Amino acid sequence: MAAERQEALREFVAVTGAEEDRARFFLESAGWDLQIALASFYEDGGDEDIVTISQATPSSVSRGTAPSDNRVTSFRDLIHDQDEDEEEEEGQRFYAGGSERSGQQIVGPPRKKSPNELVDDLFKGAKEHGAVAVERVTKSPGETSKPRPFAGGGYRLGAAPEEESAYVAGEKRQHSSQDVHVVLKLWKSGFSLDNGELRSYQDPSNAQFLESIRRGEVPAELRRLAHGGQVNLDMEDHRDEDFVKPKGAFKAFTGEGQKLGSTAPQVLSTSSPAQQAENEAKASSSILIDESEPTTNIQIRLADGGRLVQKFNHSHRISDIRLFIVDARPAMAATSFILMTTFPNKELADESQTLKEANLLNAVIVQRLT
């Protein structure tokens, strides 16, 4: 192996006339392939673009110091150093034999951008395509709001004294019912739409959405929401914050319930006013009044909030009042209730008593559900 390398070195020097150290440099760079080394030598311009940088020997160094090594560098190496920053973005480069021109170059996968760089690209791309920065929505204490243009009607003054002023109606802005306003919030680890869930920057399903934002376009999924209307998209920068899911808006209870306080709450069906009036008239006609006997008027306060007034004879019994209530409110037939006086508050338990015996002449009776 050593003999083959020595033979290649001699041939390289014989062909190019270069010094042995320089010949060895090109052969080592080409993996000791003579043809590749010669091609690299002539492509680099031979003697014209080779600079030998020798390390100066300090005067204070003694004779016993080991001789310094020479480093041979081409101008191409200097250019390569200037391009290192660009190569970092493109991916790491690998060389499989030969020089930069004659060998095979392999470029690795591009370096992934951090979320901070990704957000920068989104804002930069949006601005390049016409997006503008707006003031924050919230105002500090004492901060005045921006004036809004007048949108009402007014009077156009006449151009001459004899011309009368004319009223001019203001033009109303037409807003489509399909217009959509969306807030895109860019967080440290992802993005969200309005008060929605966090969506990752690295999720492939979100790549098309983010690319549309970077190009200054409205993403397709937002256009579908508008159904042909206008989409207003606001972008908020929260890249230094972790995603926090907003609290849901308070919703008042809209269901049904029962009022506390009654021993056995019941739901009573109500009829239409016309049907109710018909039932009350039928109930009143069912009470037979003997005009030759003394009469009295009884006021009845019903459990459903209604009020009935009926004429009775003194000889009518409390049970007749119960029947009258059931006829006036047929829904009460299947409901358990009692009758009570208002003052003093006492239950009328013995319904066989007459109104006179129970001292209910011209009285007020209350119905209570049980």
Curated annotation (Swiss-Prot):
GO terms for biological process: autophagosome assembly; establishment of mitotic spindle orientation; Golgi organization; membrane fusion; negative regulation of protein localization to centrosome; nuclear membrane reassembly; positive regulation of mitotic centrosome separation; proteasome-mediated ubiquitin-dependent protein catabolic process. Reduces the ATPase activity of VCP. Necessary for the fragmentation of Golgi stacks during mitosis and for VCP-mediated reassembly of Golgi stacks after mitosis. May play a role in VCP-mediated formation of transitional endoplasmic reticulum (tER). Inhibits the activity of CTSL (in vitro). Together with UBXN2B/p37, regulates the centrosomal levels of kinase AURKA/Aurora A during mitotic progression by promoting AURKA removal from centrosomes in prophase. Also, regulates spindle orientation during mitosis. The keyword Cytoplasm applies. Belongs to the NSFL1C family. Its main location: nucleus. It comes from Homo sapiens (Human). A motif (Nuclear localization signal) lies at residues 109-115, 172-175. InterPro entries: NSFL1C_SEP_dom_sf (IPR036241), SEP_domain (IPR012989), UBA-like_sf (IPR009060), Ubiquitin-like_domsf (IPR029071), UBX_dom (IPR001012). Keywords: Chromosome, Cytoplasm, Cytoskeleton, Golgi apparatus, Lipid-binding, Nucleus, Phosphoprotein. It comes from the Eukaryota. It holds the Pfam family UBX. Phosphorylated during mitosis. Phosphorylation inhibits interaction with Golgi membranes and is required for the fragmentation of the Golgi stacks during mitosis. Residues 291-368 form the UBX domain. It is found in: Nucleus; Golgi apparatus, Golgi stack; Chromosome; Cytoplasm, Cytoskeleton, Microtubule organizing center, Centrosome. The modification Phosphotyrosine is found at Y167. The modification Phosphoserine is found at S74, S102, S114, S140, S176, S192, S272. Residues 54-73, 261-287 have a biased composition (Polar residues). Part of a ternary complex containing STX5A, NSFL1C and VCP. NSFL1C forms a homotrimer that binds to one end of a VCP homohexamer. The complex binds to membranes enriched in phosphatidylethanolamine-containing lipids and promotes Golgi membrane fusion. Interaction with VCIP135 leads to dissociation of the complex via ATP hydrolysis by VCP. Binds ubiquitin and mono-ubiquitinated proteins via its N-terminal UBA-like domain when bound to VCP. The keyword DNA damage does not apply. Residues 179-244 form the SEP domain. GO terms for cellular component: centrosome; chromosome; cytoplasm; cytosol; Golgi stack; nucleus; VCP-NSFL1C complex. This is NSFL1 cofactor p47. Residues 54-116, 261-289 are annotated as: Disordered.
